[in-house]
């Protein structure tokens, strides 16, 4: 049996849904990190930690068709968004529920 384009697209949609759930789970962790950094008086930007994360994801990238450089670029963007969330937490711009309604776009 040959798989159809529609079937492949449905598979991609399912994977995308999982990715969104995982990214939101990561974002909730990031917000907690932001709260803790605020309480401890620690800077949001932690270049050594970012390098560590990027090295880790590039190292595990060899397990699939996306290579280390592509995965690194994706995670650079994820880290940028994480920093943005942490800034919003530190500056008190987010309410406690961390739902999308509380994540108003920056202007």
Indicate residue ranges for each PLM-predicted region.
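Domain-level signature for soluble enzymes in the chorismate/prephenate branch of the shikimate pathway
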Residues: 1-107
């Amino acid at each position: 049996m040959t798989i159809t384009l529609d079937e492949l697209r449905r598979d991609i949609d399912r994977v995308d849904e999982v990715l969104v759930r995982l990214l939101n789970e990561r974002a909730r962790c990031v917000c907690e990190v932001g709260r803790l950094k605020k309480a401890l008086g620690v800077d949001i930007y932690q270049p050594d930690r970012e390098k560590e994360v990027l090295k880790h994801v590039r190292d595990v990238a060899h397990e699939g068709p996306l290579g280390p450089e592509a995965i690194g670029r994706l995670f650079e963007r994820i880290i940028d968004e994480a920093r943005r969330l942490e800034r919003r937490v530190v500056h008190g711009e987010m309410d406690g529920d961390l739902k999308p309604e509380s994540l108003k776009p920056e202007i």
